[in-house]
C-alpha cells in the first residue's frame, strides 16, 4: 500500500494588524485624514451659510409683516378722521340742497365730528360764484368778508373743472376732493382742503362745501411709530403730493410733490395694498416699503424701514456664527496638522 498523501494545514487568510496598519501609513493615510477634515469643514460652512441665508429671509419677512400691519393700522386711523369730515360735508350739502342750511348749522355740523378745532379747523360754505359765504368760526362771513375763492384748486375742481384737469385724480368715487396742503399766508399753518360740490337734482350747482383739515395731526400720529432713524411714514395722494410725512420721528416734506422716479412713485399704483424692497435714488438706502390705500380715498399710507435696521439682529448672529465656525476651522486644521506630523515621525 502506498502512503496517503498528507493534507497541508489550512492557510490563515487574515491579514496581520501590523501589515494592515502598514498599508495605511504614509501619504495614503495623510490624504485620507486631510480630505476627511476638509469634507467635514465644508459641510459645516455650507450649513452655516444656508442657515444664515434662511435667517436673513426670515428677518426680512418679519419686517414686511410689521410694515404691512402698520400701514393697515395707520390707514384705518386716517380713514376714521376722513370719514368723519366727509360725513360733515355730506350733511352740509344735503341741508343746502334741501334749502334748510342756516349759519347756525355750520358750527353744529362741525362740532358733531368731534374734531374741532385741533383736526377740523374750519367747515365753510362757498357759493356758486366761488365766494366765501360763511363757516363754523365765521357763520355770517362778516369777519372774513365774502372773498373770492374761485381761483383755488379745491373750488375750481367743482365749478370750473376744465381749468384744473389734473385735479380729477384727487376726487373720490362719490365726489369728495382732497386737495394739496396749503400754507396759510397769515397763520403760517398748513391745511388740507377737502371739498364737495353742492348740486341739485336738476344739475344746478349751488356752491361748494369746504373742510379745512390740519395735517399736523397725522404727522403727530405717525411720529409716535418708532421705525428707526432711516424709517418713516408718508401720506401721499394720487397726485404724488405729500399730505404728511415723518422720517426718523421728525415731520418733513409737507406739501412737496414727489418725482416720477421717486421711491414711492415706483411702487405699484393700482393695488390696494402691497410691499416691495426699493432703493432710494436720493440716499441710496435700501428699504422695505409697505403701502395701503386709504379706503376709497385717493390717498395711500406708506411705511418704510431700512433693510439695514431689519437685519441688525441677523448681523449679530452672523458675526457669532462665522467667528465660531472660523475658530472651529482653525482648531480642526491645527489638530489635523499635529496628527499628520505625528504620522510622519512614526514613519
Language model regions located:
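Amphipathic coiled-coil signal-relay and dimerization helices
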Residues: 130-138, 240-247, 289-291
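Cytoplasm-proximal transmembrane signaling helix
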Residues: 302, 308-347
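Short regulatory alpha-helical segment in sensory/regulatory domains of signaling proteins that mediates
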Residues: 79, 93-100, 110-118, 159-162, ...
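Juxtamembrane extracytoplasmic/periplasmic/luminal helical "stalk" adjacent to the first N-terminal
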Residues: 21-23, 29-33, 39-102, 115-119
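Extreme N-terminal signal-anchor transmembrane helix of membrane signaling/transducer proteins, especially
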Residues: 2-3, 10, 14-55, 322-336
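Extracytoplasmic/periplasmic ligand-binding sensor regions of membrane-associated signaling proteins
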Residues: 114-120, 124, 129, 135-224, ...
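Short hydrophobic alpha-helical segments used for membrane anchoring or interfacial signaling
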Residues: 123-130, 232-239
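Extracellular/periplasmic juxtamembrane segments that couple receptor/chemosensory ectodomains to their
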Residues: 2-16, 250, 254-322
Amino acid at each position: 500500500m502506498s502512503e496517503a498523501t498528507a493534507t497541508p494545514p489550512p492557510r490563515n487568510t487574515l491579514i496581520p494588524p501590523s501589515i494592515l496598519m502598514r498599508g495605511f501609513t504614509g501619504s495614503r493615510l495623510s490624504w485620507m485624514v486631510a480630505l476627511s477634515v476638509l469634507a467635514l469643514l465644508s459641510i459645516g460652512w455650507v450649513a452655516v451659510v444656508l442657515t444664515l441665508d434662511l435667517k436673513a429671509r426670515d428677518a426680512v419677512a418679519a419686517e414686511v409683516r410689521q410694515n404691512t400691519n402698520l400701514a393697515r393700522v395707520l390707514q384705518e386711523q386716517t380713514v376714521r378722521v376722513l370719514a368723519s369730515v366727509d360725513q360733515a360735508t355730506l350733511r352740509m350739502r344735503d341741508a343746502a340742497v334741501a334749502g334748510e342750511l342756516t349759519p347756525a348749522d355750520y358750527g353744529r355740523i362741525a362740532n358733531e365730528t368731534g374734531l374741532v378745532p385741533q383736526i377740523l379747523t374750519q367747515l365753510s360754505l362757498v357759493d356758486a360764484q366761488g365766494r366765501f359765504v360763511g363757516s363754523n368760526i365765521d357763520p355770517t362771513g362778516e369777519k372774513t368778508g365774502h372773498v373770492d375763492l374761485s381761483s383755488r384748486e379745491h373750488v375750481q375742481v367743482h365749478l370750473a373743472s376744465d381749468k384744473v384737469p389734473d385735479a380729477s385724480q384727487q376726487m373720490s368715487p362719490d365726489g369728495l376732493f382732497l386737495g394739496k396742503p396749503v400754507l396759510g399766508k397769515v397763520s403760517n399753518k398748513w391745511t388740507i382742503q377737502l371739498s364737495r360740490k353742492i348740486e341739485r337734482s336738476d344739475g344746478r350747482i349751488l356752491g361748494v362745501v369746504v373742510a379745512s383739515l390740519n395735517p399736523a395731526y397725522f404727522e403727530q400720529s405717525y411720529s409716535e411709530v418708532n421705525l428707526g432713524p432711516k424709517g418713516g411714514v408718508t401720506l401721499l395722494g394720487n397726485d404724488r403730493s405729500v399730505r404728511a410725512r415723518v422720517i426718523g420721528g421728525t415731520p418733513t416734506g409737507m406739501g412737496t410733490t414727489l418725482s416720477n422716479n421717486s421711491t414711492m412713485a415706483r411702487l405699484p399704483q393700482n393695488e390696494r395694498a402691497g410691499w416691495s424692497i426699493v432703493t432710494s435714488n436720493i440716499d441710496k438706502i435700501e428699504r422695505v416699503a409697505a403701502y395701503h390705500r386709504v379706503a376709497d380715498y385717493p390717498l395711500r399710507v406708506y411705511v418704510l424701514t431700512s433693510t439695514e435696521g431689519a437685519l441688525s439682529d441677523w448681523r449679530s448672529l452672523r458675526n457669532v456664527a462665522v467667528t465660531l465656525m472660523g475658530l472651529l476651522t482653525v482648531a480642526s486644521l491645527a489638530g489635523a496638522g499635529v496628527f499628520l506630523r505625528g504620522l510622519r515621525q512614526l514613519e
